């Protein structure tokens, strides 16, 4: 603001000071004394002696311009130093006429914008790192310090424990894995190691024991599960091998689910013998039977036992399939039943078996009708199932 100089003895000065002829003498705002000088300085409606209007910081007399904050007045430089923008490095105010440097939101003097390590002033285009406390580090010094820190961390000093010291610590650990403070102090005095070294050694030892126990339990259970997996794998491979062998044997037999007549010969007790001298009902030995054999005739007992699982000839699955055999001759007409409790009654002429009945003494009876080739609803599909319906208790 501009200072206003007023003369006290003229009407003009009275008008400038705002007086209307009042005999009241103004009082100085600096020394609180009445102003009887020829000239009076006026700042914000306050009157000053010429010698009392000074800068609050540098005490220089203010003649033309001054800056006020509260009850204090300042010169231009001191006002901006105190209340203006401050440098982030030196924390001093920056006058508005000076050239500054900026880094993000921080403002620096030109001479303060320098590396804190090498003290080199940074110019436009230089690369630098801005630290958290607003300090500046040039790129070369930053990378050097970082590399030095990494090397010091990698080459930290290691404590060497002798064999005697180690033996003492092991004995103490066997007595108490977690010793009290006075025990650690005693061990420190005995071994000559630092208290911190003794404490860290016990901590590492306890962690190692815990890790070894955990690893041992994991290995035990791992071996157990591996054995279980191996045993399951072996059993599964056995089942797979059985299943793989099954289709090979099934491919060689026409009817796989039914027992062969040779097996029924001795197990069921119904067909006890089969020979050439057995009585034949309704046919001769020279005629073609149910089996289309190359030499012709009825199969003998030795030939019949050769009908095994690897034979291309199979046993008919149901009585309905007998109608499709050559000559439509019943298979049961070629078999002899020496047991007295079971008989076969055939009706019809030679080579023709229109109807037959299997009669058991005390067992159930069923009719076989050859009137059609569509099948027999009274009997199930398997010959073993309907042959087993005969009561075996009487035999």
From Swiss-Prot:
Subcellular location: Nucleus
Region: Disordered, residue numbers: 208-304, 363-383
Chief location category: nucleus
S-S bridge residues: none
LIM zinc-binding domain mapped to chain residues: 28-78, 87-141
MF term (GO), any: transcription coregulator binding
Biased composition (Polar residues): 257-278
SMART domains: HOX, LIM
Residue ranges of the annotated DNA-binding region, renumbered to this chain: 154-213
Any single GO CC term annotated in Swiss-Prot or TrEMBL for this entry: nucleus
InterPro entries recorded: HD (IPR001356), Homeobox_CS (IPR017970), Homeodomain-like_sf (IPR009057), Lhx3/4-like_LIM2 (IPR049594), Lhx3_LIM1 (IPR049593), LIM_Homeobox_TF (IPR050453), Znf_LIM (IPR001781)
GO process terms (BP): neuron differentiation; regulation of transcription by RNA polymerase II
Top-rank taxon: Eukaryota
PROSITE patterns per record: HOMEOBOX_1 (PS00027), HOMEOBOX_2 (PS50071), LIM_DOMAIN_1 (PS00478), LIM_DOMAIN_2 (PS50023)
Tissue specificity comment: In dorsal regions at neural tube and tailbud stages and in adults predominantly in the pituitary gland and weakly in the eye and brain.
Keyword field: Activator, DNA-binding, Homeobox, LIM domain, Metal-binding, Nucleus, Repeat, Transcription, Transcription regulation, Zinc
Subunit details: Interacts with ldb1 and with the N-terminus of rnf12.
Job description of the protein: Transcription factor. May be involved in the specification and maintenance of differentiation of distinct neuronal and neuroendocrine tissues. Early marker for the pituitary and pineal lineages, it may be involved in specifying these lineages.
Name of the featured protein: LIM/homeobox protein Lhx3
Species name: Xenopus laevis
Gene that produces this protein: lhx3
